Amino acid sequence: MDLELYDQTTTGAQPEQLQLIRDLIDLAGQTLKLRDDTEVSVTLMNNDAIQKINEQYRGVDRPTDVISFAMHDDDEDDLIVMDPEMAAEMPLNLGDIMISVDKVSEQAAFLNHSEARELGYLVVHGFLHLNGYDHLQPADETEMFTLQRQILDAYGLEK
């Protein structure tokens, strides 16, 4: 996976947090059998920054834990027609994942597990959204959460 990591926090992300993100993105990409040159970005930020994004793009004026912006969706009106051979040679850019480190701390304390577990959960959750998984319908929720749990367990971040 070709991962771009951005740290917009005021305190600075710890090296082990950044490594956790790299490892989980790689593992999730392997689990989904994505090409090695698949691109994704993860941005760490605080509650104030993610609240502004949540308000601007979702109309919800409060901080959230994770927001994913998929580069591609299933809307055929947005499809760009290109030579299939050329498309196969280009890396796939999945999109962007934004995570509130404040929410990581808050939710880890509330759920009584480690911040690493919470950060890992949000990384994988956001990554699966970028790959078309959602949890709006019960069957879809079961599929997404089962895959999420498998990836986290395989990495050693069991609940």
UniProtKB/Swiss-Prot annotation:
Query: Is the Membrane keyword given for this protein?
Result: no
Keywords assigned by UniProt, alphabetized: Cytoplasm, Endonuclease, Hydrolase, Metal-binding, Nuclease, Ribosome biogenesis, rRNA processing, Zinc
Q: Which domain of life is it from?
A: Bacteria
What the entry lists under PROSITE patterns is as follows: UPF0054 (PS01306)
- One Gene Ontology cellular component annotation held by this UniProt entry: cytoplasm
Query: Which cofactors does this gene product need?
Result: Zn(2+)
Q: Which GO terms describe its molecular function?
A: metalloendopeptidase activity; RNA endonuclease activity; zinc ion binding
Annotated residues for binding of Zn(2+)? H125, H129, H135
Enzyme Commission designation:
3.1.-.-
* Entries under InterPro entries matching the protein: MetalPrtase_cat_dom_sf_prd (IPR023091), YbeY (IPR002036), YbeY_CS (IPR020549)
Localization of this protein: Cytoplasm
> Where's it mainly located?
cytoplasm
What biological processes does GO assign it?
A: rRNA processing
What does the Swiss-Prot or TrEMBL cofactor note state?
Binds 1 zinc ion.
Q: Which Pfam families match?
A: YbeY
Q: Look up keyword RNA-binding and say if it applies.
A: no
Query: Belongs to which family?
Result: Belongs to the endoribonuclease YbeY family.
Give the protein's function. Single strand-specific metallo-endoribonuclease involved in late-stage 70S ribosome quality control and in maturation of the 3' terminus of the 16S rRNA.
**What is this protein's record name?**
Endoribonuclease YbeY
Q: Which organism is it from?
A: Lactiplantibacillus plantarum (strain ATCC BAA-793 / NCIMB 8826 / WCFS1)
Q: What is the lineage of its organism?
A: Bacteria, Bacillati, Bacillota, Bacilli, Lactobacillales
What gene codes for this chain?
A: ybeY
